[in-house]
Amino acid sequence: MYTRYSYNPSLGRTYVYDNKYYKNLGAVIKNAKRKKHQIEHEAEEHTLDPLDKYLVAEDPFLGPGKNQKLTLFKEIRNVKPDTMKLVVNWSGKEFLRETWTRFMEDSFPIVNDQEIMDVFLVINMRPTRPNRCFRFLAQHALRCDPEYVPHEVIRIVEPSYVGSNNEYRISLAKRGGGCPVMNLHAEYTNSFEEFINRVHWENFYKPIVYVGTDSAEEEEILLEVSLVFKIKEFAPDAPLYSGPAY
């Protein structure tokens, strides 16, 4: 029993406070940082407001310009499970001479006032046997050392699934955008070898591409490899109206 002289452990430790005058310290700091980040984000958005009047294509392949497709080769490859096979290696110049000759002379007349803005490597894959249920895989590299010798077969490690239409598309442009190549016909006429090495590969990457499947069996794949050139089209140098005054 407690008396007026007894020690009561609850004395001096009991108190009452109103929660509205107290806030969690962590919540205060987080709220301050959140407001600071919001102000910085709004200031950054204001600097980008002048760009709202411009339009860009989400997919550069579908952007402005004319797509000129040139089929390099078609062939059948057998791919074993859990492996990927090398299908494109630009260390050699196979398929280039015939393709570029046809491109320059027959398929598309290149003149001096036209530019190649971008080059896409397009690989279309189709199964040769019916009623097969699997997905295509692909991996590629663009910045390989010139002396690097790629393996013919590699194991599947973090591949990319091929998208719609079983088509794998790679932009070969350097520096994050198209690098215009002009005077193509004159450069090609002077020397084919110099044109490929000095003009084409100086502005675009040499790709290395592996393909495979997620099937548990060996599959036979029909490959169609092509280059798609994004040609910049200029307005014709001609009057808008034709008549006696022109």
UniProtKB/Swiss-Prot annotation:
A single Gene Ontology CC term: viral occlusion body
Pfam family, one: Polyhedrin
GO molecular function terms attached to this record: structural molecule activity
Classification via InterPro entries: Polyhedrin
Record keywords, A-Z: Viral occlusion body
Keyword Cell cycle attributed: no
Domain of life where this protein originates: Viruses
Family: Belongs to the polyhedrin family.
General function of this protein: Major component of the virus occlusion bodies, which are large proteinaceous structures (polyhedra), that protect the virus from the outside environment for extended periods until they are ingested by insect larvae.
Name of the protein in its database record: Polyhedrin
Organism from which the protein derives: Orgyia pseudotsugata single capsid nuclear polyhedrosis virus (OpSNPV)
Record lineage: Viruses, Viruses incertae sedis, Naldaviricetes, Lefavirales, Baculoviridae
